[in-house]
């Protein structure tokens, strides 16, 4: 599985676009969640999907500390790298 930052961003963008019923290109990974129309229910759904897809635990406050898809991807990449580091 590709766990690069860009792969995580692509995964999150596709998931959010599907939930919001918009084109993937309309999901700016640099935009704040509220600007994208991501409410708490969608944020929780995204969090759950990310946890299942990448087999990682993510605390809910992570989304508040990282309020863009890019920031979430950076955070996840760091968490995944720590998990596989010797």
Could you tell me what each predicted segment is?
Residues 1-25, 76-86:
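Thiotemplate assembly-line natural product biosynthesis machinery
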Residues 11, 45, 67, 71-74:
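Amphipathic alpha-helical interaction segments
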Residues 16, 49-51, 72:
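Hydrophobic micro-packing sites on short alpha-helices
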Residues 42-67, 83-86:
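Phosphopantetheinylated carrier protein domains
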